[in-house]
Amino acid sequence: MLTITKDNFEQEVLKSDKKVLVDFWASWCGPCRMLSPIIDEIAKETDKVKVGKVNVDEESDLATQFAVMSIP
């Protein structure tokens, strides 16, 4: 599982040769924790899509940039 930050977002997402599934999440979010195993399974089952996670508490600039108002 790829951890996406403001430092690697451009390289890992915008310049990726593959489609990218980005999961915006937070450790305090119960539904996010419920979805996490499903997101992890998607990442393991396919190599056609890159899967990454953005912790909205640690990367609030990215959450703001993409107008993430609530999660999940």
Task: Give a label for each model feature.
Residues A63-I71:
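Thiol/disulfide oxidoreductase modules built on the thioredoxin-like
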Residues L2-V20, S60:
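A short beta-strand-turn-helix
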Residues V13, S36, F66:
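Short, flexible helix/strand-to-coil boundary loops that buttress conserved ligand/catalytic motifs
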Residues T3-T5, F24, S36-D61:
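Thiol-based oxidoreductase modules, predominantly thioredoxin-like and allied folds used
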Residues G30-R33:
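Cys/His/Pro-rich metal-binding microdomains
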